[in-house]
């Protein structure tokens, strides 16, 4: 059993999350990457994606749904491998 303080456990956790991100639809992948990894604001994401017909609240809702989808994939993967998160 591996404790979560262990470096190998943290690496495994990161690999699982990254793998689950890759399984997301392209729009979700892009939005979550821009927001969480690149530190972009919602306004910056709207501009970068060239989305003229979406409001900040619309993007916020979309990001939330993408995040919920990612969380579900991560939970499923952890339970499939009998890991605790």
Where are the regions a protein language model picked out?
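Amphipathic alpha-helical segment used for protein-protein interaction
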Residues: 1-33, 40
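DNA-recognition helix of helix-turn-helix
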Residues: 28, 37, 43, 49-79
């Amino acid at each position: 059993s591996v404790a979560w303080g262990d470096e190998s456990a943290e690496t495994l956790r990161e690999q699982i999350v990254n793998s689950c991100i890759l399984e997301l639809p392209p729009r979700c992948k892009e939005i979550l990457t821009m927001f969480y990894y690149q530190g972009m604001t919602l306004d910056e994401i709207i501009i970068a994606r060239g989305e003229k017909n979406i409001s900040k609240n619309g993007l916020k809702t979309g990001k939330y749904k993408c995040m919920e989808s990612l969380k579900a994939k991560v939970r499923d993967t952890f339970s499939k491998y009998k890991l605790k998160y």
